[in-house]
Amino acid sequence: MEILIFLTIIFILSSVNLSTQYLSNYKNLEFNKNDHLGSSYIWSNHSKFAGLTIFFGDSVIKGFFPVFLSKYILNINNEYIFLYILIIQMIGNNWSIFLKLKGGRGMAIAIGSLLGINFVLALILYGSYLILYFSKFKDGGITWIISLTITAFISIGFSLNVLYCYLACIFLTILKRVTGNQFKFDINIIINRIIYDRDFR
């Protein structure tokens, strides 16, 4: 029962979209709910400082803190608790109940959550992303998927539970990209969304 209550709180917290709160309450601006409303959207279209602040909120408060809380403070005794937390976090963030099942991409919240789950693998994930981004792709969409996949393979040597977390993250990331905030049944668009996280290359 305690786990169910804890996961419900995480789901509600993850569903709070900090970008829309910033736009509607602080800036009093209209926004298109079909956009991927995350920290990168605010960074690119409004304010670098606000984008970083929202990224911190998504990755640390919404992502890392619930995992840290379950591991070191609540001492929840469940073999798959990290997997449950990650899945709930990404579902809440990507398909927010406060935005009619629309939301962000889930990258920031996954960054924080995976750091809490396994520090070493998270560093490998971040390192892979930075190396691939700056040396090869210069594109965050394809770089993120490849980095997650590389780290998932490496995680096999650590723990099956951690592997499941990375596989769940990959699946939910691809699912969000395919469906977007407005699904389009076009094979070229779907492929571009999976690889590049946008409708057109």
Residue map of PLM features:
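Helix-coil boundary and interhelical linker segments in multi-pass alpha-helical membrane proteins
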Residues: 1-7, 63-84, 115-121, 154-165
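Cytosolic, membrane-interface loops and tails of multi-pass inner-membrane proteins
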Residues: 22-52, 182-201
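Short, non-helical or kinked segments that cap or interrupt transmembrane helices
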Residues: 28-38, 97-109, 138-146
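Multi-pass membrane catalytic core of lipid/isoprenoid biosynthesis enzymes
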Residues: 45-71
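Loop-to-transmembrane alpha-helix initiation sites
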Residues: 122-124, 139-147, 156-171
